[in-house]
Amino acid sequence: MTVVDAESRFHVLAVDDSLIDRKLIEMLLKNSSYQVTTVDSGSKALELLGLRDEGDDSSSSPSSSSPDHQEIDVNLIITDYCMPGMTGYDLLKRVKGSSSLKDIPVVIMSSENVPARINRCLEDGAEEFFLKPVKLADMKKLKSHLLKRKQQLPMAAAAPDKPPHKPDEAAASAAAIAEAATAQTDGIISDCSCSGSSKRKAAAMEQEVISSPDQRTKPRLSSTSSGLAVET
């Protein structure tokens, strides 16, 4: 298998305190073309996922098939229910309570068929509850949950925010032009009013000069057949 093929496979984190069950689930997952990381406790699973079990002071490292004290990206978690320290249900609650991990599908396994336990896990976010021994047919059920999450990832990405609303530039330009035109029209009307007023004022002054007493008593010259004559 090429490196590209290996990287393109879904990555499953398997958690089980039983070495035999852990090896079985690892084999089934690999036969189903999944990339697998296994750990033997819920606290180690949290450590690999970037969370920390507050009640676990153990310094032991994960199993040999897992990276040592590294945060890893996984596409699905499959965990045993009955484990010492942290149960599979406790691990489910921690994962679903994390803002960064809550979308990772979690599948729980158990050798005990307890309906109340099964219902509680499914109601609190588990995708499936498998009864042990786990079969190859169970592994095929995982793909639908993996594909569902893969389709949800692009949809979950935040849509780009709309740019802040800006006034329409064309409308702003039109408003500016209209305002300038109005101002120009007002100026023309004002000029016309001033011009008319000046003409009326000049006509009044001319009339006043004509009707002035000095102008009426002033002698006027008139022409006759014998020459010029003075009229009073």
Curated annotation (Swiss-Prot):
GO biological process: cytokinin-activated signaling pathway; phosphorelay signal transduction system
InterPro entries: ARR-like, CheY-like_superfamily, Sig_transdc_resp-reg_receiver
GO cellular component, one term: nucleus
SS bond list: none
Location within or outside the cell: Nucleus
Entry's induction text: By cytokinin in roots, shoots and leaves.
Superkingdom as given in the UniProt entry: Eukaryota
Polar residues bias locations: 209-232
Entry keywords, A to Z: Cytokinin signaling pathway, Nucleus, Phosphoprotein, Transcription, Transcription regulation, Two-component regulatory system
One Pfam family named in its UniProt record: Response_reg
PTM annotation: Two-component system major event consists of a His-to-Asp phosphorelay between a sensor histidine kinase (HK) and a response regulator (RR). In plants, the His-to-Asp phosphorelay involves an additional intermediate named Histidine-containing phosphotransfer protein (HPt). This multistep phosphorelay consists of a His-Asp-His-Asp sequential transfer of a phosphate group between first a His and an Asp of the HK protein, followed by the transfer to a conserved His of the HPt protein and finally the transfer to an Asp in the receiver domain of the RR protein.
Region of interest called Disordered, as start-end residue ranges on this chain: 153-174, 202-232
Tissue localization of expression: Expressed in roots, leaf blades, leaf sheaths, shoot apex, flowers and panicles.
Positions bearing 4-aspartylphosphate: 80
Residue ranges annotated for the Response regulatory domain, each copy included: 11-147
Primary localisation category: nucleus
PANTHER family, A to Z: TWO-COMPONENT RESPONSE REGULATOR, TWO-COMPONENT RESPONSE REGULATOR ORR4
Protein family: Belongs to the ARR family. Type-A subfamily.
Functional note: Functions as a response regulator involved in His-to-Asp phosphorelay signal transduction system. Phosphorylation of the Asp residue in the receiver domain activates the ability of the protein to promote the transcription of target genes. Type-A response regulators seem to act as negative regulators of the cytokinin signaling.
Name of the molecule in the record: Two-component response regulator ORR4
Organism: Oryza sativa subsp. japonica (Rice)
Gene: RR4
